[in-house]
Amino acid sequence: MKTRITELFGIERPIIQGGMHFVGLAELASAVSNAGGLGLITALTQGSPENLKREVARCREMTDKPFGVNLTFLPSINPPDYPGYIQAIIDGGVKIVETAGNNPQRFMPALKEHGIKVIHKCTSVRHSLKAESIGVDALSVDGFECGGHPGEDDVPNFILLNRAAEALSVPFVASGGMANGRSLAAALALGADGINMRSEEHTSELQSP
């Protein structure tokens, strides 16, 4: 199957593994990538930039397919070493980054300079348009069905995806409540270029033992 997302990321199926804390390790990311989707290592799960470098190297031993890193920018009095994580991504040769949370604009020049494609998670069309304006390559549009994220406007995907398709120029995937092929077909019909899945992949046979 070809969509703008498969062509952008060089994957076989328009399915992205959402970043999940605690389980966003090389085993899950490589399993998703080997199955034709886009697996993601969760940066903050690793605990430090050095650990992220090691996890990226482990993932390369498990797959020769494209995979990426999820990096969530959280408001904090003592924030994680975000510049260090960005440098670890660059040093590890990662070419796809999923960002979430706060605006990633301050890190965009460094990522773009190294040819890294950025997909940013948004929970509204207005935030999606802002992300598009700062140069992200793609978007994950998260409807109210999506768990684990603040900022939803109580707008479900059946409404949100239609609006996103009307307003956005860059490719976008649907996130929230995506579980199987019927979900993918529905998302494509509503204008998305693929889907972002989390819990379903972790609880399926796709997850390596």
Specify the residue positions occupied by each region the protein language model found.
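Acidic, glycine-rich active-site loops and adjacent beta-strand->loop/helix elements
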Residues: F73, E145, G177-M178, E200
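Glycine-rich adenosine-cofactor-binding loop
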Residues: V170-L184, R198
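Conserved small/polar residues in nucleotide/adenosyl-binding loops
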Residues: E200-S208
